[in-house]
Design a protein with these regions (language model features):
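Extracellular beta-strand/loop-rich beta-sandwich domains predominantly from IgSF
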Residues: 28-33, 65-86, 94-99
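Intrinsically disordered, low-complexity regions enriched in proline, serine, glycine
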Residues: 36, 51-55, 63-65, 87, ...
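C-terminal edge beta-strand
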Residues: 104-110
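N-terminal "mature ectodomain cap" immediately after the signal peptide
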Residues: 20-49, 54-56, 64-67
Length: 125
């Protein structure tokens, strides 16, 4: 995954969030994982060719991750989860002019001693 400055920073900032429909964020194999397991977060939007970004709300002041799409979706892979990877995630996408989508619903990821089921659930704020 590629790290980028937070969108409120001066360089490379997103100018117009909310111009495109919000994407869907899902977790595979599920939102409840054990340390050391692999996790894929999929961000999917309706528009092809956009750049996708994943944000962990607990790390807003640090950065977010960028991915080039596979058609209209991007996968953010965590090879070996750690306890500190648990948290509230959301995603968005944007075009080459830094015009962005609405933010996805928040997806809560747990990293515990037990593993959960498929796909995850979004938390509506």
């Amino acid at each position: 995954m590629m790290r980028k400055n937070h969108p409120t920073s001066n360089s490379g900032s997103l100018h117009f969030l909310g111009l495109y429909p919000k994407p869907t964020l899902t977790a595979y194999p599920g939102p409840i994982m054990a340390p050391g397991e692999s996790l894929n977060l999929r961000c999917q939007g309706p528009i092809y060719g956009m750049t996708f970004a994943l944000i962990r709300l607990e790390d807003l002041e640090k950065s977010f991750y960028l991915k080039r799409p596979i058609k209209n979706e991007a996968y953010f892979f965590f090879r070996a989860l750690k306890i500190h990877d648990a948290g509230h995630y959301l995603c968005f996408y944007y075009d080459g002019s830094y015009r962005g989508s609405l933010l996805s619903d928040i997806l809560k990821i747990w990293v515990t001693g037990k593993r959960g089921g498929c796909c995850g659930t979004s938390v509506r704020g």
